[in-house]
Amino acid sequence: MFWKGPVFTKDGFRNRTINLENCEVVEGFDGEEDGIIVPLFRNCHTHLGDTLARDTVPKDLSLEKLVGPDGWKHKWLEKNNIEDSVVAGMKEVIRSGTGLLLDFREGGKEGLSVFDNIEYPGTVILLGRPKNGEELPGKNAGISSLKDVSISADLATAARKKGGLVGIHHSENEREDID
């Protein structure tokens, strides 16, 4: 069985024929194309734990009251089954052809453990955030803002010592000087 059509490469689209049985790829094709092939998408900023929350978000809240430390989102996360929300988000991710995602995980070790029993055919990088003064719960840090520079710096240092990544929300609500 063969597939024929444009394949997106680092040099742009190239017409190719692909033997689906042995994955051999040859230049060009005859006849009509079967479609196009593009690399899997990457989403480097997800919050899969809130997937099911978005349909119930009050419309009249400020950003601070919505996602602040004691905001609506954190109360929602405490009251609801986060695993169900993550599974719903993963189904969307799979349907959209996303092969790599970075997910900001609230809730410390418990927040990271939600992924222990969830299968995903791609790559998930979890950006953990400690709760209640605990240490960085994994090797990667998900920083909510630069407002508290000392805590952010400590988390970034801990992640780097573990060979991890650091993801940060920057200037979502107000201008923050990244320098």
List the predicted regions and their residue ranges:
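A conserved glycine-rich beta-strand in the N-terminal activation segment of trypsin-fold
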Residues: 12-20
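Active-site gating loops and adjacent loop-to-helix segments of metal-dependent hydrolytic enzymes
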Residues: 51-84, 164, 174-179
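Short, acidic/polar
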Residues: 79-92, 108, 128-134
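Short acidic/polar active-site loop segments enriched in Thr and Asp
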Residues: 99-100
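Charged, low-complexity intrinsically disordered terminal segments
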Residues: 103-106
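Metal-coordinating catalytic core of metallo-dependent amide/deamination hydrolases
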Residues: 108-179
